[in-house]
């Protein structure tokens, strides 16, 4: 008896939720049409950073964005320009002025451009920070820093994709189309 009641209750709740989602205009990000189609039509350009590590972080951001949204066709209607920035900050200094922890921050300043007209459609900045304990020895710090840059850049790229999806699902993007 109780099972039958729970089954009816779950079916009723499922129908109510489905109706509410259909009524609110909810569109899944990866569905056909909508933001997913627009994300697949973006040509990505990486602007040079001011340092080698900026460029390394930019490379990881670029690779992650391409992995997530794919590579664009030759006639892409949009161009995404990304300018990377890397910062490492020492934390937890010992009495010998040696850091025991580091924070790595990767920032991606981006601009979405209409490829035909050159008009700037949207711009933003995404940032992520990763902390790591400093291993003993200089090579351990270098290795940990390299891994930290890659992890932080991937997280930054994921946030950038969310910002782009938010733009393409907005009324502002629909007015441009």
Where are these regions (language model features)?
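Short linear motifs at secondary-structure transitions and domain/linker junctions
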Residues: 17-22, 53-60, 80-89, 102-103, ...
């Amino acid at each position: 008896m109780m099972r039958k009641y729970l089954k009816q209750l779950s079916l009723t709740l499922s129908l109510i939720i489905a109706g509410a989602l259909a009524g609110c205009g909810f569109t899944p990000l990866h569905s056909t049409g909508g933001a997913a189609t627009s994300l697949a039509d973006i040509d990505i350009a990486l602007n040079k950073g001011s340092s080698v590590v900026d460029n390394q972080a930019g490379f990881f951001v670029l690779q992650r964005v391409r992995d997530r949204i794919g590579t664009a066709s030759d006639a892409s209607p949009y161009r995404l320009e990304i300018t990377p920035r890397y910062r490492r900050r020492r934390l937890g200094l010992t009495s010998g002025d040696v850091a025991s922890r580091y924070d790595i921050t990767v920032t991606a300043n981006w601009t979405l451009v209409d490829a035909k007209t050159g008009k700037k459609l949207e711009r933003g900045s995404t940032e992520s920070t990763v902390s790591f304990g400093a291993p003993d020895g200089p090579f351990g710090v270098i290795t940990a820093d390299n891994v930290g840059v890659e992890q932080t850049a991937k997280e930054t790229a994921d946030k950038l994709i969310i910002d782009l999806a938010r733009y393409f699902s907005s009324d502002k993007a629909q007015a441009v189309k």
